[in-house]
Every structure is written in C-alpha cells, then in structure tokens.
C-alpha cells in the first residue's frame, strides 16, 4: 500500500486529535518511505535475484493493519469491512481505480480479505511499538493462555509465528459461540413446534455441524498457509544472517517517536535506525535500531548527559579519517574538502591550516621586501656605474684634447713680468711682444706702424681665459695700439710666436766654444741693445752660430720661415679651436680675429726679413 493511498482513508483532522494517531501516522510515513525506496531499488535491477521481498511484504502489511486500526479507533468502522460489504462495481470504472482498490474489489481476493479483517480485529498493532515490543492479543475472558515470548527484534513475522495458535483458538471459539447463539434462538423460536418438526431440527443440526466443520477446515487451511509462508520467510532471513553481510553506504535518518504518558510508565522512547557502531546490511528489513529512554524532565538515565552524536555526512566510510572515531558531536572538513574528520581532529587541522596561512603571509611579505631591496640596490649600482662611465668619458675627452694640443706646433710659454709674481709660470697661446730699449724702439715702431696702418684692418677684441687664474684680458689690436714709443716701455705684440725675455734668463755662454742644445722650443729672441740701423740683414739659428771676439754673429737666416710656428689656416678656420699648451687655452671663435692674427704674422715676417744681417754689439739672442 502506498502513502498517497493511505491519505485517502485517514482524515487529516484526526492526526492531531490524539497522540496515538500521531504515532501511527509517523510509522505509516516511515514504512511507506522504506517500501518505496526498496521497491525502486528492485525495479532498477529486475534481473538480479538476490533481493529479499520479505521486508517489503512485512512493511506493507504493517501499513495496512495500522490504517485499519486507525480508522476503527477514529470512526468505529473498518474500511476493510466496508469494501467487503459493498456491492460489486462495474468493470468500466476499473481504469479510474487505484491498484489498491482493484485488489480489494477483486472477488478472487475476498476470502483473503476476510481473513485479514479477522486478523486485524484479533491483534492490536499499536501495542507493538511499546517498550516490550510485543503485541497484545485481544482474547475472550474465559481464555487464560498467554502468548509465548516474542523473538528478538521487531520482526513482524516472528510476532505472527508466535501468536498463530492463539489466533486460531480465538477464531474457533468465536465461531462456536456464534453458532450456539444462533442455535438457541432457533430452538426458542421452534419450541411450540409439533413432533413432526423434531426430524427437521435433527436435519438442521446435522447441517449446522457440517457447516462448522467446513469452516474449521477453511480456517485451518488459511492458518497452514500462513505458517508455510512464515517458515519460508524465516528460512530466507536465516540464510541472509548466516552469510557475511555487505555494508551499504546509505544512511537513513533517525526518527523520534513519542508515546503518551501511561499510569504505569511515563517515558519517551527515541529510536535511531542508523546506529553507526553496527554496519547496515543490504536487506532493509534487518536495519538495526537503538532505543534511548529519556524521562519527561529531559534528564537521561545515564550518569552524564551527552549531546546527540551526528552521523558521518560522507558516503565512503563512517569513521574519522584521522583517528578512526565513528561518533562525534560535529563532523568537520579535512584536507580533501569533505567532512571526513571528527570534531577534535577537525579543530587541530583548522589550527594547522591557520598557522600555515600566517607563515605563508609572512614569507610572502619577506620575499616582497627582499625584491624591493634588491631592486633599490640594483638601481643604486646602475647609477654608480653610469656616473663612473661619465667620469671616464670626460677623462678620455680631456686626454684626447691634451694630446691634440701637445702635437700642435705652438710656441713654448715663457715667464713674463706682471703685477703679481704668482702668475709668472702661466702659459699664453699668443706670446707677449719683446721689450725693446728706448734707443731702438723708435725705428722699429715707425716701420711697423707704417705697415699696419696701410695694409691691416682693425682687429676685434679677443678674450683669453686661464684655468689657474680668473683674469680676463680683452685687448684691441689695431694700428694705434702698435705704437712703439720710446717714452713708454710697454711691450708690443710683434708676433704670436715671439716673446720677450728678461736679462735674468739663460743666454748662450759667449766665453765657451761649445754648441749645446738650447732650452725652449720654438726659438724666440730678444734684442736688448742694437744700433739705430733700420735694416738688419738676417738671423741664423743656433746650428750656424760661431764665436768671434766674444760676440755672437748669426747668419743664413734667409731660409727661416716663421709661419711654421703658427697654426695652419685650415686649422684656424674652425669655430672653436683650442690654442695653447697645458692648462691655458685660448678659444678663437671669430673669423675676423683670425684674419687680424694672420695680418700681424705677415707683417712680422716682412719686418724680420728686412732687418740687416749684421747685429751690433750688446745683442743677446735666446733660441
């Protein structure tokens, strides 16, 4: 019988009216759910013959009897009795009937339904779920026999097998009593009959006896069939129990039932259908139950109150994967993500995970700080390398410039007199003019002034910068500035490669007859004393010098070219040309200045080539 079919015969308002009804209704729900689950399992694999149908038969019969008992208690009328006494229904409406109604209304099943009706009146199903777990048989008062003790468990067929004899005796006694009552009524109604009717009464008595015998035979046959069915079922159950049961992973929900307080015992029983300590078997009928008795105050009979143990919510096993515990107050998640750990192991695992997370965060922070430090160090190293490379490049540029300046054919810087004695060793790219005496300056100045005033244009101002001192001179070279007056002893720029020398400078030793190498390159000269002759023939180098009466005579200067000590015009045409030796550099950035300088050089060449070759006494020449 299905659950939806039971709702048709049980009024919904009657469930909450009596606690007994609630108990029966909960049991109907439980058994109907188990019947549906087991039947669906069997239908999913019809080819397999290892399924036991005894559990389905047992629970469906229990549902049937509980509904019968429920309706009789509520409405004082059995619905089974109503089906048996109803007139037959047309076969056209069989399609609209349910399967249960078709079975009940089938005439071939009428005798079986009658036996079930008598069986439901004899046994009280509601007494099965009490603490003693044995049915109470309704027997007449004259019977003093007690039912034998039930077998272990709540097996319904064990209850049937233990009470079949009592049911048989009760049914026979009820039939005899009914027959006796009817017989007495018939005798009282026929008391005034004549003697002719005595023969008919004897015949009637014989017929009644035959009817009773037939009824007894029928009942005996029905009981024998029930005994055979019970034996077959018990044999199958024993075979299943003897074989090794295979554990299943399905877990059933625990159900709690409450029995109303009775004067003898006011207790509530809680049944748990999934005791984790005992493995479940494939047969649903052999599911174990554990009963825990708790008083109305909520205090258990044990020494201490324990929280209810939750079953494992995973399907692979029913134990803790760490410690093997099968019961715990709460199942916790393990490393696999499933709730496979008990409460204690789960707490320990959570603490370990939290510590590992904290360590991972610390390691991440440390690694980030290390990367930041490494990046900052690398940036500093790169900056230092760039600075070093820049310094090296600057040094290389300075060295290249110095090498270029060293190879240029420029005049050697000599010391010159100035206001401060500290600037005597500084070198100048353009030599200072040599100082002439007051006697010879007038003739040379007049000659140069006449040349420069007629041929050379005015020279723009130039700026020379020294590295040792920050003095800046910007003389303007013109024809007026080249005035060699005898009154003023200021030096005059004769040539960029000619410098004036002092009397303290080293001269050629006129007393010795040796030709040693002279200091300084290129050769410069200084004429201190000479006659007022306007023409000097020629000068000779130190290689051609000869000693004559303590005086130096120079000759063969006609081939001497002073322009070889001046930079070439191609070199002078550059916009920024460094002229000088050492730290002193002069920048020539104007073409007009270069033109003026070349004019001075040509004038000096004409001057010296026009001088007479004979040099008077008192002339000292330093080469």
From Swiss-Prot:
Superkingdom in the source lineage: Eukaryota
Keyword Zinc among record annotations: yes
Zinc finger (GATA-type): 320-345
InterPro entries recorded: GATA_TF, Znf_GATA, Znf_NHR/GATA
SMART domains per UniProt: ZnF_GATA (SM00401)
GO molecular function: transcription cis-regulatory region binding; zinc ion binding
GO CC terms: nucleus
Biased composition annotated in UniProt, kind: Low complexity: 167-179, 410-482
Disordered: annotated segments: 137-156, 167-197, 245-289, 398-509
Record's protein name: GATA zinc finger domain-containing protein 6
């Amino acid at each position: 019988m299905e659950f939806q079919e039971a709702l048709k015969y049980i009024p919904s308002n009657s469930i909450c009216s009596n606690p007994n009804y609630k108990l029966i209704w909960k049991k109907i729900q439980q058994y109907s759910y188990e019947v549906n689950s087991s039947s669906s399992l069997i239908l999913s694999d019809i080819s397999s013959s290892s399924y036991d149908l005894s559990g389905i038969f047992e629970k469906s019969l229990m549902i049937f009897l509980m509904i019968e008992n429920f309706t009789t208690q509520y409405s004082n009328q059995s619905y089974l009795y109503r089906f048996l006494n109803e007139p037959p229904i047309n076969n056209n409406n069989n399609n609209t009937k349910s399967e249960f109604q078709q079975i009940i209304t089938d005439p071939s099943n009428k005798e079986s339904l009658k036996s079930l009706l008598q069986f439901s009146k004899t046994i009280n199903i509601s007494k099965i779920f009490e603490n003693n777990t044995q049915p109470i048989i309704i027997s007449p008062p004259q019977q003093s026999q007690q039912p034998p003790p039930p077998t272990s468990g709540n097996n319904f067929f064990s209850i049937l097998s233990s009470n079949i004899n009592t049911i048989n005796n009760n049914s026979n006694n009820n039939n005899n009593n009914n027959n006796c009552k009817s017989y007495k009524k018939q005798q009282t109604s026929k008391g005034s009959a004549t003697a002719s009717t005595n023969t008919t009464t004897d015949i009637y008595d014989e017929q009644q006896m035959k009817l009773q015998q037939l009824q007894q035979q029928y009942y005996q046959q029905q009981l024998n069939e029930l005994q055979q069915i019970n034996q077959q079922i018990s044999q199958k159950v024993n075979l299943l129990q003897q074989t090794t049961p295979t554990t299943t992973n399905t877990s059933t929900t625990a159900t709690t039932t409450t029995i109303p307080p009775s004067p003898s015992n006011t207790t509530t029983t809680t049944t748990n259908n999934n005791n984790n300590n005992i493995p479940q078997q494939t047969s649903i009928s052999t599911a174990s139950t554990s009963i825990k008795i708790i008083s109305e105050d909520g205090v258990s009979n044990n020494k201490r109150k324990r929280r209810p143990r939750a079953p494992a919510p995973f399907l692979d096993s029913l134990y803790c994967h760490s410690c093997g515990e099968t019961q715990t107050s709460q199942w916790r998640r393990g490393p696999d993500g499933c709730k496979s750990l008990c409460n204690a192991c789960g707490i320990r695992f959570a603490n370990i995970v939290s510590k590992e997370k904290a360590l991972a965060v610390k390691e991440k922070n440390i690694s980030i700080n290390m990367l930041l430090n490494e990046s900052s160090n690398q940036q500093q190293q790169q900056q230092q390398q760039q600075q070093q490379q820049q310094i090296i490049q600057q040094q290389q540029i300075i060295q290249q410039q110095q090498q270029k300046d060293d190879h240029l054919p420029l005049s050697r810087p000599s010391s010159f007199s100035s206001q401060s004695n500290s600037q005597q060793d500084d070198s100048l790219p353009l030599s200072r003019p040599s100082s002439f005496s007051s006697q010879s300056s007038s003739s040379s100045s007049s000659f140069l002034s006449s040349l420069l005033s007629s041929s050379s244009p005015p020279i723009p101002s130039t700026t020379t910068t020294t590295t040792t001192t920050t003095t800046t001179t910007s003389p303007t070279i013109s024809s007026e500035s080249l005035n060699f007056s005898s009154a003023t002893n200021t030096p005059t720029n004769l040539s960029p490669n000619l410098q004036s020398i002092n009397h303290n400078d080293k001269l050629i030793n006129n007393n010795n007859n040796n030709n040693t190498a002279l200091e300084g390159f290129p050769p410069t000269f200084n004429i201190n004393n000479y006659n007022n002759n306007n023409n000097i023939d020629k000068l000779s180098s130190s290689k051609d010098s000869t000693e004559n009466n303590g005086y130096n005579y120079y000759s063969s200067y006609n081939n001497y070219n002073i322009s070889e000590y001046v930079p070439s015009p191609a070199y002078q045409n550059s916009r920024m040309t460094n002229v000088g030796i050492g730290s002193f550099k002069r920048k020539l950035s104007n073409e007009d200045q270069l033109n003026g300088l070349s004019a001075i050089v040509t004038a000096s060449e004409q001057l010296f080539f026009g001088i007479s070759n004979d040099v008077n006494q008192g002339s000292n020449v330093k080469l």
